[in-house]
C-alpha cells in the first residue's frame, strides 16, 4: 500500500493537528485547519444553485471531484464540508488518472438504516473489464492477475461498474460533467458525542 506524505499533499503536519489515521479522534477545528491548508486553488469557489445546494471542484492531482452538497449539506457545519473536501483532495492526489468524478453529497437522516448502492453505471462484459483492469494497473502491480479466468464470474458474464470507475477505465468519457457518478449520504441520525 502506498502512503502519501503530508508534503506530497501540500500539507504540513502542524496544520493537520492530530488528523493522522492512528489518532483516536479529530476535532472539527483540526479538519477545518487541514482543509484550509490545502494548496491554493485546490478547491474552487462554490457555485450556488436555486435549490440551496452548492457545487465545488476539488483538484490536487489526477482526478477532479465535482462535489454537489445538497441544501442540508451546504448548511452543515463548515468542518463537515471541509472534511469532505479534504478527503476528495487526498483521493485526487493519490489517483493519477485524468477524469472528472461528479458526486452528490447528502446530509440527512436515514431513519437509522444504512445502505450502499451504485447510483449510475453500466454493465460491462467481465472479460473486457478484467482486461481493462490489467491494462490500467500500475507497473509491477499483479493484483488483477488473480482475477478468475474465463468469461464469467459467479456465473455472470456482465458486471455492474459505476460511472466513476468507468471513467477511470475509459469506458465512458472521462471528463463528462453531466453525469452523476456517485453519491454519499452522511447520516445525521447517528450521534456524534
Predicted regions and their residues:
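Extracellular zinc-dependent metalloprotease catalytic-domain scaffold
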Residues: 1-193
Amino acid at each position: 500500500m502506498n502512503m502519501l506524505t503530508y508534503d506530497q499533499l501540500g500539507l504540513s503536519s502542524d496544520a493537520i493537528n492530530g488528523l493522522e489515521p492512528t489518532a483516536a479522534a479529530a476535532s472539527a477545528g483540526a479538519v477545518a485547519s487541514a482543509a484550509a491548508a490545502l494548496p491554493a486553488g485546490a478547491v474552487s469557489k462554490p457555485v450556488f444553485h436555486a435549490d440551496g445546494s452548492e457545487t465545488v471542484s476539488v483538484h490536487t492531482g489526477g482526478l477532479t471531484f465535482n462535489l454537489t452538497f445538497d441544501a442540508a449539506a451546504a448548511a452543515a457545519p463548515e468542518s463537515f464540508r471541509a472534511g469532505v473536501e479534504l478527503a476528495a483532495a487526498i483521493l485526487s492526489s493519490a489517483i493519477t488518472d485524468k477524469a472528472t468524478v461528479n458526486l452528490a453529497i447528502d446530509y440527512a437522516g436515514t431513519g437509522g438504516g444504512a445502505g450502499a448502492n451504485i447510483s449510475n453505471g453500466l454493465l460491462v462484459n467481465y472479460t473486457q473489464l478484467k482486461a481493462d483492469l490489467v491494462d490500467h494497473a500500475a507497473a509491477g502491480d499483479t493484483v488483477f492477475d488473480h482475477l478468475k479466468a474465463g468469461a464469467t464470474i459467479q456465473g455472470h458474464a456482465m458486471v455492474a461498474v459505476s460511472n466513476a470507475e468507468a471513467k477511470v477505465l475509459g469506458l465512458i468519457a472521462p471528463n463528462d460533467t453531466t453525469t452523476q457518478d456517485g453519491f454519499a449520504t452522511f447520516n445525521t441520525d447517528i450521534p456524534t458525542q
